[in-house]
Amino acid sequence: MAETPYSSAPGTATSQTDDPGAAQTPEALRTPTKRLSLGFILMLCLANVALWFSMQPVTNILVPEQVDRFDPDPSRQIFYNGLILFGGALLSVFSNPVGGALSDRTTSRFGRRVPWLIGCGALSAGALALMANANGIALLFIGYGLYQLIVNGALAALIAVVPDKASEQQRGFVSAFVGLTLPVATVLGAVVVGLLITNIQIGYYILAVTLVVVMVLFSLMLHDARLPRSAVKPFRLGEFLRGFWINPRQHPDFGWAFLSRFLVNVGWNTTVGGLLYQYLKYGVKVSNPAASVAIAQIIAVVMIVLSSIVGGYLSDRFQRRKVFVIVSAAMIAVALLVLALVTSWTAVLVAAVIVGLGFGAYLAVDLALLTEVLPSANDRAKDMGVFNIANALPGAIGPLAAGILVPVFGSFQPLFFMATGVVLLAALTILPIKSVR
C-alpha cells in the first residue's frame, strides 16, 4: 500500500490519540500521534523555504539596494531603510496573530490552512510586483507594508502545520528541519538575488513566482482536515480580540518562551539582522556589500545546518530542550561580542561561524520547546501567531532604533555591545520554564 504523508511507523498505533474522547474531537483539533513521512517533512520544508525565500532577500538586499539608488546620502539611507522595515514589521505584528486566529476559525472544505496559504501567497506576489516597480521611497514604503501585511497571513498558517501534524515524539526532528529553512532561504535569496541576478525587478519576479508555485504544490499534499462549523464558537469581536491576550500568569511557560525569543530577536535585529548590508558597506567598508552579505550568510548556513540537525536529534534523544536553547543563545551572544570588539572582514567570517552554530540549534530546539508550551490545541495558529510577535516586533523596532542610534554614536560598536547583553539575558529567561525539561 502506498505511503501517505501521515503513515504510521511500524508498530505505531493507528488511532489518532489514546484519549477515549478522541472520537468526539474533530480531526483538525486532535493531538497528532502518527509519524510524518520523510516525503511530507521535506515538502513542508520546501514550503517554508519558499516563504522565507520570498521574504529574506527583500529585507536584506532588495530594499537596501533600492534605498541606495533613491538616496545617495549614507545617514539618510540607514534611516529610510530602518523606517521602511519598521513600517512593514509593525504591520506583521498585527497580521500574523490575526491571520492565525482567522485560520483557526476557517471551516472551508479545503481545511483551515490551505485557503490562507494559497490566497495570501497569490496576493503577496502582487505586492512584490508593486515593489519591483517602485520609483521612490514612498511607494517602496507602501509596497513593503502591504507585502508584510499579506505574507504574514500565509506564514501564520504555515507555522501551525508543525503542531497540527507532528507528534510530540517527532517534533524535535521536524522542528530541526523546519528551523533550517530560514537560514537556507536566506542564503538562497542572497545567492540568487545578491550574486546571480543583478536586476532588481527580475529578482522580485523570481521571488513572487516561486512563492505561488510552491504554496500550491504544498497545499495539494497537505490533506488539511476540515473543521466542522459546530466546533467553532460564534464570532464575537470582543471575545475574538481578548483571545490575543495570553495571560503570562495563567501560562507562565509560554510567557517565558515569548520573552526569550523576543530578547534574542531584539539583539539580532538591532545589529546584523537588520543592518548587515549597511554594516558591511559603512562599518567594514567592503567594496561589494551585496556579495559580502551572500558570502557571510553561506558560511553561517553551513554551520546552521550542522548544528540544527545535531541539536534537534540530541534534544529528542535526551528529551531535553532548555539546556540546548540556553547554550545556543549564549553562542549567538558570543558572535555579537566578536563584532563589538573587532571591525574587520575576518571578524565577520568568524562571527558567521559562531552565530551559525548557535542559531542552528536555537531555531530547531526553541521551536520544539514552543510547541510544547502552547496554551490550547484549538488555537494553535493564533497562539503561534501571538508568539510570532516576538519575531516581528523586534524586526520593527530594531532597524529603526539602529537607524537613529548609529548616527548618534558615530559607529556600530555600541549597538553590538548592547545586543550582546540582551541576548545573554534571553538565555537566562529560559530557566524559569517548568513544564519542559
Locate each region found by the language model.
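Juxtamembrane intracellular "pre-TM" segments in multi-pass secondary transporters
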Residues: Q16-S37, A225-L259
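Helix-loop boundary and gating motifs at the non-cytosolic
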Residues: P26-A89, D253-K285
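Intracellular juxtamembrane helix-capping segments at the cytosolic ends
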Residues: V63, G153-A166, Y362-P375
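A membrane-interface helix-boundary motif in multi-pass transporters
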Residues: Q77, R112-V114, L195-T210, I404-V423
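Glycine-rich segments within core transmembrane alpha-helices of 12-TM secondary carriers
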Residues: S92, G172-G194, N388-G398
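Helix-to-loop junctions at the C-terminal end of transmembrane segments
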Residues: S95-F110, S307-R320, V406
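Structural signature of the two symmetry-related core transmembrane helices
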Residues: R113-A129, V323-V338
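Multi-pass alpha-helical transporter architecture, strongest
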Residues: A132, V214-H223, F417-R437
